[in-house]
């Protein structure tokens, strides 16, 4: 059985600029098909526009507000919103109010699968 507590996961900054606490991923558990992490962005912060060749992502907004951009389309997002980011889609999220959200990737997140403009 694999159980990870949020407080035991050390935050780090990913290649896209968000701060992450990785709950279950290739580095800390025997996951094979997906990964789960919590991301935070300060008010006014954003991820760098990027895409993943292999991973489909799901974001689930817990706190804050922002603007999600996927392949040139933008929409305001907030608590309770779930966002699908298809593999290969350029995307970026900007925090208009400090944000906290869950990220699920399938296959699991890997730095090597993150590409920038």
Where are these regions (language model features)?
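Conserved short histidine dyad/triad with adjacent acidic residue
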Residues: 37-53
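Short acidic-glycine-tyrosine-enriched beta hairpin
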Residues: 72-87
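Histidine-centered metal-chelating micro-motifs
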Residues: 46-48, 83, 87-92
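A cytosolic small-molecule/anion-sensing beta-strand core signal
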Residues: 62-63, 78-79, 97
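Ligand-binding loop in jelly-roll beta-barrel domains
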Residues: 87-111
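Glycine- and acidic-residue-biased ligand/ion/polar-headgroup-sensing regions
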Residues: 54-56, 60-66
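A short, N-terminal "cap"/entry segment at the start of jelly-roll beta-barrel domains
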Residues: 1-33, 48, 114-117
């Amino acid at each position: 059985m694999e159980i990870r507590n949020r407080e035991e996961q050390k935050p780090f900054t990913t290649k896209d600029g968000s701060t992450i606490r990785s709950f279950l991923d290739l580095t800390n558990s025997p996951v094979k098909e997906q990964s789960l992490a919590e991301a935070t962005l300060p008010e006014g912060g954003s991820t760098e526009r990027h895409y993943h060749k292999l991973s489909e992502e799901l974001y689930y907004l817990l706190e804050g507000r922002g603007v999600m951009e996927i392949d040139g389309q933008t929409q305001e997002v907030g608590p309770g919103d779930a966002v699908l980011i298809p593999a290969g889609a350029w995307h970026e999220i900007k925090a208009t109010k400090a944000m906290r959200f869950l990220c699920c990737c399938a296959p699991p997140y890997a730095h090597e699968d993150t590409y920038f403009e």
